[in-house]
Amino acid sequence: MRLLVNNKKAKYNYELLDKYEAGISLSGNEVKSLALHHGKLDDSYVIIRKNEAYLLNLLIPKYKFDTSKVLNETRTRKLLLHKSEILKIDLIKKQHSLVIIPYQIYFVNNKIKVSIYLARPKKRYDKRQTIKEREINKKIRKY
């Protein structure tokens, strides 16, 4: 597994619950751009429409050696999941009022995969608690 892009804000803003791995439909130039570690997952999210999963707001900048037509850098991209997985994710999401966020994009056996999580947004006091715990752990490691 070779990590390409990571969502740095995910652990701070969300409580991550269930993990799923999905393929992603990309053009060749987008793959080349991601292979150079260009991309941003910070504001992206997953929606389920008509029993298909889509990744929105994933920023993949234009590959610098690309001479073809310009695609929208934040276009909607289809996620490749089994229908049973999509139905299961959608059911859990609706029952527990969760969101689906992408956490990482990585290579596995020359295929680009996206790890998505069912997550619960953190409240402001939860974020403060996370910061306090992190500072305490730093002090403990220091001594």
Curated annotation (Swiss-Prot):
GO MF term list: RNA binding
Record keywords, A-Z: Cytoplasm, RNA-binding
Gene3D superfamilies registered for this protein in UniProt: 2.40.280.10
SUPFAM superfamilies: Small protein B (SmpB) (SSF74982)
GO cellular component assignments: cytosol
Location relative to the cell: Cytoplasm
InterPro entries reported in the protein's UniProt record: SmpB, SsrA-bd_prot, SsrA-bd_prot_CS
Domain of life: Bacteria
CDD domains named in the record: SmpB (cd09294)
GO biological process, any: trans-translation
Presence of the UniProt keyword Cytoplasm in the record: yes
Family the entry assigns: Belongs to the SmpB family.
Function statement: Required for rescue of stalled ribosomes mediated by trans-translation. Binds to transfer-messenger RNA (tmRNA), required for stable association of tmRNA with ribosomes. tmRNA and SmpB together mimic tRNA shape, replacing the anticodon stem-loop with SmpB. tmRNA is encoded by the ssrA gene; the 2 termini fold to resemble tRNA(Ala) and it encodes a 'tag peptide', a short internal open reading frame. During trans-translation Ala-aminoacylated tmRNA acts like a tRNA, entering the A-site of stalled ribosomes, displacing the stalled mRNA.
Protein name: SsrA-binding protein
Organism in which the protein naturally occurs: Mycoplasmoides gallisepticum (strain R(low / passage 15 / clone 2))
Gene: smpB
